[in-house]
Amino acid sequence: IFFDPPIKPDTVDLELVKPYLPTRTPLGKLVGELSRDILGSPVLKGLKVPPQLLENLRETLEVLTPKPGIIPDEVEIEEQVEKSGVRYEAKVKQFFRQTEKSIVRKELTKDLKGQLLELLQVTEKNIKSLPKQNLNQKISDFQQRVKVSVDSIELNQLSSRISTQENQPLVLQIPNPLSPGDKTINLFIREDSEGEQDGNNEDKKNYNMAFFLNLSALGSVKINANVGPENLVVSMEVEQDDVADF
């Protein structure tokens, strides 16, 4: 689920994109801002936004909101990645390629980027129909907030494309249920080039994964894992000597 079909992508000019990458918002923070600034905005009452769109967006943000103390299983993490917007274009491509479109269409309605693009389209249409005297700064700010959210998701997508292009680890953002302060876990994934590989069989490939946690009792912890179809090797690195000795 993490990768688009094996096609040769267009090359991204790193020098053009690099200045914009620091402006992207981590997924966990973005979800909180959308819940507050979009779903909680009084502007919604004056815009003719379809109730189903708002309900779909609310459900998606609920899935992407960390639940403190509740550790998601693999199915829930897969759902979070699928709904985060990073694979929106791949789903659109799949929609046009498949003859049975109802399943893919349903997935598109549950995709965060797709929902924000639809909300932006509805908002712009409503703004054009409003008399000029009814336009105010709050409506303009709302429209800009939706645009910035879409831009942030697209910058994360570009970052993933650049990582692949530069042979760097792919980074997946996952809601962090372990820390109320840091709402996003960055999961770094790289195909294992040293293990036995079958280039024609995705199911037989090995991957190296790593993520970092900042825990109140243990300090900073790095979790490394080598994952294959029949093996899982996990190691931990800590910065405190007493924790390592334990």
Labelled PLM ranges:
Residues 1-246:
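Extended non-catalytic alpha-helical interaction modules
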